[in-house]
A protein has these predicted regions:
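Short, conserved catalytic/metal-binding motifs centered on acidic residues
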Residues: 28, 91, 210-211, 225, ...
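Short, amphipathic alpha-helical "recognition" segments used to contact nucleic acids or chromatin
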Residues: 21-37, 85-98, 208-216
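Short, solvent-exposed helix-loop connector elements
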Residues: 43, 192-198, 463-470, 486-502, ...
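Short, basic interhelical loop/turn and adjoining N-cap
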Residues: 44-55, 109-122, 199-200, 230-248
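Dynamic "connector" segments at or just before major functional cores
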Residues: 93, 136-311, 318-338, 345-350, ...
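Short, basic alpha-helical/linker "hinge" immediately adjacent to a nucleic-acid-recognition surface
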Residues: 39, 44-45, 49-93, 118, ...
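Short, Lys/Arg-enriched anionic-surface-contact patches
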Residues: 2-25, 72-86, 196-203
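An anionic, glycine-rich sequence signature occurring as long contiguous blocks
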Residues: 153-155, 160-161, 376, 381-488, ...
């Protein structure tokens, strides 16, 4: 017997009892085709049944069986990036230092591990880093707007003018144009009257001013305050070295109650009356609801009709009142539910009586603002109202029975094709749930398919004046559209009504501020909307210079700078929350 060569010593079981799937298939097929074994014999040797061997042979003959990996080009396998993986940790570390993708690529080349800018950007995207926003430092960004890294911004605190730089550049210098009117309204006194809480570090007025700055700069959400942290003008506006961070600003509303907002609005309305931003003598108000839609499925929120979606959706219902004399908002409330929404008209009457000492003279509202029973309560208080009546089947039969001789044509003092409507008046009409009778006007020719039915308890007002007054009610919808566009009122700040309550009150304050600012710009801006004022004036860049007790804001030259030069701006204002320093404006 021939002795086995030492070179052949090994493990024959690796061939006779293969463990890898493809190797076992190969040996079974070889036994069938080369050694001439039957299906059953080849299968028994390598652990297959007879039918499994038949299928294996069939797939092999059909070319469907891949037993060996196809040859590939030399180098790393497709889909792998060993160079990127090797420097991934270093790329992350350099990004946390505030370097851009170009700077990271240059730094890696200097360290002997080169990687192009595109690969660096891909690593940053994979790791969740956003776009790098540059701060004032030449090399490293201090902006917290870059996700995945810590911020170097200091904690919020009252501004220390002793350490404040003598001169600073800012992109928000125009925001400080609103400060003189804040002083006129005496915001610190309003805050104290409302009882807003402060903290050990930040006074209550600065908390409110910080949130107000977000409204005036059209910052959509409180969580977007990061966009303003590096700008000195927004912090100076609130009397702080740096604005509070988003967590602190969000948590502040949780410390408040509805009573805080009501006391603040009462004090604000008194100041608005004194400044001519609201009228106490006429006391005619437009009332309306507005549903702020929630883009989620929070079961706690009730469903209300959302006009922008033409359907009912989960939302926070808010209520607003507008002074018809000045077209300024004077009241807002977000602490409303379906069970209480019908009594909002009564709640506003109570509010205005606390402000002026008497009930409103007249309320103008849509038919869904309140019920007939509440209209009876308003009549008992001596409050006049004008609203629409729902067109029931019986009312439509009554309207259809009228002939052309039953109508009287009147002329309205307004331009357009619908200034000569036809009116049929019923002096005493009974309603289902109203305790007395009301005056009813059936109006056609206003551009609507169906007649408009107006009801009122005012027997003295002339027909022409009543129709004109109700037609002007639509301006409150314009006010709501303005605060949505300018102050992001439709960006729901929370699913908790009390938190939204503070948000809508800040919208009323911001609208009053820009209304006061608008009056200083001259008659050409009498109807300018808040977003126009923000875009043309408040978004102006400039320089802040500190000289002793005087802070001078130099506004950069823009297309509308001549308007500011000729306006009635306060040129020298003492600011209480700046430790009584003076604010001056000048133009470059």
């Amino acid at each position: 017997m021939t002795a086995r060569s030492a070179q052949r010593e090994g493990k024959p079981g690796w061939f006779t009892s293969p463990q890898q799937v493809n190797q076992r298939r190969y040996e079974a097929l070889r036994a069938y085709f080369v050694d001439g074994l039957s299906y059953a014999e080849a299968g028994a040797r390598f652990g297959y049944t007879r039918w499994a061997m038949i299928n294996l042979v069939r797939e092999h003959r059909a070319g469907k069986l891949e037993l060996f990996a196809p040859p590939r080009r030399p180098g790393p396998a497709p889909g792998t990036a060993p160079a990127r993986d090797r420097v991934r940790g270093r790329v992350i570390a350099l990004r946390r230092q505030g370097l851009s993708s170009y700077e990271i690529s240059a730094r890696l080349s200097a360290e002997g591990t080169p990687l192009n800018r595109t690969s660096v950007a891909e690593i940053l995207t994979e790791e969740g880093f956003g776009r790098l926003l540059r701060g004032p430092a030449p090399e490293a960004s201090i902006s917290p707007a870059t996700p995945g890294r810590d911020t170097n911004m200091p904690a919020a605190a009252v501004i220390d003018f002793g350490t404040w730089p003598q001169q600073l550049d800012t992109t928000r210098a125009g925001l400080l144009l609103a400060i003189p009117d804040l002083v006129t309204l005496d915001l610190p006194a309003l805050t104290a009257t409302a009882g807003y809480p402060g903290t050990r570090v930040i006074p209550a007025a600065s908390w409110l001013l910080s949130l107000l700055a977000l409204k005036l700069t059209r910052t959509r959400r409180v969580s977007h305050v990061d966009d303003l942290l590096a700008d000195p003008a927004t912090a100076l506006f609130a009397g702080l070295a740096v604005l509070p961070k988003k967590t602190a600003l969000t948590d502040y509303s949780y410390r408040l109650s509805h009573d805080h907002q009501q006391r603040f609005l009462a004090a604000l309305d008194k100041k608005m009356i004194g400044a001519g931003l609201a009228t106490a003598q006429e006391a005619v108000f437009d009332l309306d609801f507005h549903a702020i839609m929630h883009w989620g499925q929070d079961p706690v929120l009730e469903k209300h009709y959302v006009p922008s979606r033409s359907q009912r959706a989960r939302s926070v219902l808010t209520f607003f009142a507008q002074d018809t004399g000045t077209h300024n908002l004077v009241y807002a409330n977000a602490d409303i539910s379906k069970a209480t929404q019908n009594r909002e008209a009564i709640a506003f009457c109570d509010h205005w009586k606390a402000v002026s000492g008497s009930d409103p003279k007249m309320l103008i509202m849509d038919q869904k603002v309140t019920t007939q029973a509440i209209l009876g309560e308003l009549d008992a208080r001596g409050v006049k109202f004008a609203t629409l009546r729902m067109r029931s089947a019986s009312l439509m039969n009554r309207i259809n029975s009228l002939t052309s001789t039953d109508y009287k044509t009147i002329t309205l003092d307004r331009p357009g094709p619908y200034n000569r409507p036809r009116v049929h008046e019923d002096p005493a009409v009974t309603l289902t749930s109203y305790p007395g009778t009301v005056r009813q006007l059936i109006v056609t020719g206003l551009g609507r398919d169906a007649p408009t039915v107006i009801i009122t308890n005012d027997d003295q007002i002339k027909t022409r004046a009543l129709i004109s007054q109700y037609a002007r009610r639509m301006t409150i919808e314009q006010r709501l559209a303005e605060i949505i566009g300018a102050f992001c009122a439709d960006a729901l700040s929370s699913t908790v009504n009390l938190n939204v309550d503070l948000d809508v009150v800040l919208c009323v304050l911001a609208q009053a501020l820009l209304a006061a600012f608008r009056t200083r710009l001259g008659p050409g801006y009498a109807t300018a909307t808040p977003d126009t004022l923000q875009r043309r004036f408040l978004d102006t860049a400039g320089t802040i210079t500190t000289d002793g007790d005087t802070i001078t804001v130099t506004l950069s030259r823009r297309a509308y700078s001549p308007v500011l030069r000729q306006s009635d701006l306060h040129t020298d204002t003492t600011i209480p929350w700046w430790q009584n320093r003076r604010l001056r404006f000048q133009f470059s």
